Amino acid sequence: MSRLREQYENEIKDAMIKKFGYKNAMEIPKLDKIVVNMGVGEAKENAKVLEAAVKDMEAITGQKAVTTKAKNAIANFKIREGMPIGCKVTLRGEKMYEFADRLINLALPRVRDFRGVNPNAFDGRGNYALGIKEQIIFPEIEYDKVDKVRGMDIIFVTTAKTDEEARELLAQFNMPFAK
């Protein structure tokens, strides 16, 4: 069992019950999944760029990445329907907790001029979205082998009903929110 999962089972559940007064154990919010998405706009000119992005994504998450395709054509961006334009990974279970642990304790502190993540990036339904400007903050990525610095979106999907509950859950996981 991963460190964050153990922390959730032993400490966080009790703290959440104390704070919000849940009567049923199933009411306690938990991390449902983490979706990591990387939009690669240059993929329309060069397919090798997308391959490199997929390789980086797989190294970071430890799971096979799925290429995302354009849903509809956008003439201004020279994109046709069905063109590969990015990649994503959906993490659940143990891999999700392992990734969250690495992100919170290893990767985020390596961001330049890091003052904490935005505490207001919740969507109103208890999900948290986080944007990262460069993939080189992860220890799995070798700096010398990176062809181009790319950003990614990380979405924490929780079973929380409100943003306040989700914020407390992530704060219990030691998510470094900006003050």
UniProtKB/Swiss-Prot annotation:
Keywords linked to the UniProt accession: Ribonucleoprotein, Ribosomal protein, RNA-binding, rRNA-binding, tRNA-binding
Gene this chain is encoded by: rplE
GO cellular component: ribonucleoprotein complex; ribosome
Assembly: Part of the 50S ribosomal subunit; part of the 5S rRNA/L5/L18/L25 subcomplex. Contacts the 5S rRNA and the P site tRNA. Forms a bridge to the 30S subunit in the 70S ribosome.
One of the Pfam families matching this protein, by short name: Ribosomal_L5
Family to which the UniProt record says this protein belongs: Belongs to the universal ribosomal protein uL5 family.
Keyword Transcription: no
Descriptive protein name: Large ribosomal subunit protein uL5
GO biological process, alphabetically ordered: translation
Species for this entry: Agathobacter rectalis (strain ATCC 33656 / DSM 3377 / JCM 17463 / KCTC 5835 / VPI 0990)
Single GO molecular function: rRNA binding
Function description: This is one of the proteins that bind and probably mediate the attachment of the 5S RNA into the large ribosomal subunit, where it forms part of the central protuberance. In the 70S ribosome it contacts protein S13 of the 30S subunit (bridge B1b), connecting the 2 subunits; this bridge is implicated in subunit movement. Contacts the P site tRNA; the 5S rRNA and some of its associated proteins might help stabilize positioning of ribosome-bound tRNAs.
